[in-house]
Amino acid sequence: MGAPSTGFGQRFRSQKNRVIVSQKHLGRVALWMTGALLSFSVMAVSIRGLAQALNIFEILAIRNGCGVLALLALVVARPELRASLRPRRMLLHGLRNSVHFASQYAWALSLTLLPLATVFALEFTMPIWVALLAMPFLGERMTLSRLGSILLGFVGVLIIVRPGMESFRPALLLVLAAAFGYAVSLITTKQLTATVGTFAILFWMNAMQLPMGLAGSDPLFLLKLEPVHLPFAVGVGIAGLSSHFCLTNAFRSGDATVVVPFDFLRIPLIALVGWLFYGEALDLFVFAGAAVIISGVVWNLRAEWRGA
């Protein structure tokens, strides 16, 4: 048998090296993703806890207020970061953060109306919307795997939502709207990263969204908080930052094909949280729909990884 072609050999070595690197950093990815999964769960429970005393605008104001304070503290500790905060592409920042705030509002509100596992399962439709939006806005082509991922995603959504049946709840549309908004936010983030650093994107996200939250808040809303609510306020503030921090470091430590399967553990974990803390039933339709959505995402990820 003849020797493999140079192109095939290079591709084989590239894939082999990626597998070795992925295995080498698997422990680190697992550690960061554990932090991210715990942060997402704490965020969901904290929003539900605060919703007993505050409206969604006020909850988001706490989250973004904590973010602004933490990022300003970093600027004080590292003065060289100030240069990165120079206003640049502010119209795109404004578009991104307006859509992101609306998405956060819809997501947080859905947490107070639906079982936690249902919200988290439908949130995984975001990659479907990203694939659709990437064609007109980023010029990316539609591949067979992306098309298959989109079709499987919509089938999974139909299994979870079950339109036309008695189990259908309008609040389910809130989660789908939030997932679509997060996809728009991700597309605009990719456009921003061409000229704007990550720290600046995070800073302007919190700085712009804080007044949006305050606009719908009672000026004295913090006085509504009783001692029983304080752990939830701290949870929203910390989890809002730690979730993004851990997720970013997980993707930095390993390939998406390694990180994303860990992220899928969000659904059984949050289902367990909902069952333990709120007595929420484990809905087989939610798990079946989530499995279909996830299979489409995994198919596309594997195809993209092999073709890279």
Segments from the language model and where they lie:
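C-terminal-most transmembrane helix of multi-pass membrane proteins
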Residues: 4, 8, 268-308
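Glycine-/small-residue-enriched transmembrane alpha-helix faces in small-molecule transporters
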Residues: 4-58, 167-191, 308
